[in-house]
Amino acid sequence: MTVAVYPGTFDPFTRGHEDLVRRASSIFKELIVGVADSRSKHPFFTLEERIDIAKEVLGYYPNVKVVGFSGLLKDFAREHNARVIVRGLRAVSDFEYEFQMAGMNRYLLPDVETLFLTPSDQYQFISGTFVREIASMGGDVSKFVFPSVEKWLVKKIASDSQNKE
């Protein structure tokens, strides 16, 4: 059976991410959710926080592991003997970047395939950026993230507000 990796920043982990994990985990023997360090993106949550959040949401999937990584995806995929990289495509605008990335990954890892999954209809518009922005303005994000993630957001926003005062 095949091992797949689903890499991302997951800042924060949304219902759309979980939707892709649920569907991909039914296809593969093992799915490794790779939480990327992504320091260049200046994530809202630390790597450790994003790993903990993803583990809280995905803890009931027996064939899913959550692992943090930094460096090249090709090295992460090799380290975990992955044969497939799972990527989500929310909109046509995602396709060009993801297509180029898949080509580069195929060049670097000729024996690893990229599988694109589109989210279920109700999750196509969700992005971590939108969720963070709505939450930071006191909006309701309960339809976009799980209750545990919403608690993390509220706590982090409150902590950041106190630090700015």
Curated annotation (Swiss-Prot):
<feature type="binding site">
    <location>
        <position position="41"/>
    </location>
    <ligand>
        <name>substrate</name>
    </ligand>
</feature>
<feature type="binding site">
    <location>
        <position position="98"/>
    </location>
    <ligand>
        <name>ATP</name>
    </ligand>
</feature>
<dbReference type="InterPro" id="IPR014729">
    <property type="entry name" value="Rossmann-like_a/b/a_fold"/>
</dbReference>
<keyword id="KW-0173">Coenzyme A biosynthesis</keyword>
<keyword id="KW-0067">ATP-binding</keyword>
<keyword id="KW-0808">Transferase</keyword>
<protein>
    <recommendedName>
        <fullName>Phosphopantetheine adenylyltransferase</fullName>
        <ecNumber>2.7.7.3</ecNumber>
    </recommendedName>
</protein>
<keyword id="KW-0460">Magnesium</keyword>
<feature type="binding site">
    <location>
        <begin position="123"/>
        <end position="129"/>
    </location>
    <ligand>
        <name>ATP</name>
    </ligand>
</feature>
<comment type="subunit">
    <text>Homohexamer.</text>
</comment>
<feature type="binding site">
    <location>
        <position position="9"/>
    </location>
    <ligand>
        <name>substrate</name>
    </ligand>
</feature>
<feature type="binding site">
    <location>
        <position position="87"/>
    </location>
    <ligand>
        <name>substrate</name>
    </ligand>
</feature>
<feature type="binding site">
    <location>
        <begin position="88"/>
        <end position="90"/>
    </location>
    <ligand>
        <name>ATP</name>
    </ligand>
</feature>
<dbReference type="GO" id="GO:0015937">
    <property type="term" value="P:coenzyme A biosynthetic process"/>
</dbReference>
<dbReference type="GO" id="GO:0005737">
    <property type="term" value="C:cytoplasm"/>
</dbReference>
<keyword id="KW-0547">Nucleotide-binding</keyword>
<dbReference type="GO" id="GO:0005524">
    <property type="term" value="F:ATP binding"/>
</dbReference>
<comment type="function">
    <text>Reversibly transfers an adenylyl group from ATP to 4'-phosphopantetheine, yielding dephospho-CoA (dPCoA) and pyrophosphate.</text>
</comment>
<comment type="similarity">
    <text>Belongs to the bacterial CoaD family.</text>
</comment>
<feature type="binding site">
    <location>
        <begin position="9"/>
        <end position="10"/>
    </location>
    <ligand>
        <name>ATP</name>
    </ligand>
</feature>
<keyword id="KW-0548">Nucleotidyltransferase</keyword>
<dbReference type="Pfam" id="PF01467">
    <property type="entry name" value="CTP_transf_like"/>
</dbReference>
<dbReference type="InterPro" id="IPR004821">
    <property type="entry name" value="Cyt_trans-like"/>
</dbReference>
<feature type="binding site">
    <location>
        <position position="73"/>
    </location>
    <ligand>
        <name>substrate</name>
    </ligand>
</feature>
<dbReference type="GO" id="GO:0004595">
    <property type="term" value="F:pantetheine-phosphate adenylyltransferase activity"/>
</dbReference>
<feature type="binding site">
    <location>
        <position position="17"/>
    </location>
    <ligand>
        <name>ATP</name>
    </ligand>
</feature>
<dbReference type="InterPro" id="IPR001980">
    <property type="entry name" value="PPAT"/>
</dbReference>
<feature type="site" description="Transition state stabilizer">
    <location>
        <position position="17"/>
    </location>
</feature>
<keyword id="KW-0963">Cytoplasm</keyword>
<comment type="pathway">
    <text>Cofactor biosynthesis; coenzyme A biosynthesis; CoA from (R)-pantothenate: step 4/5.</text>
</comment>
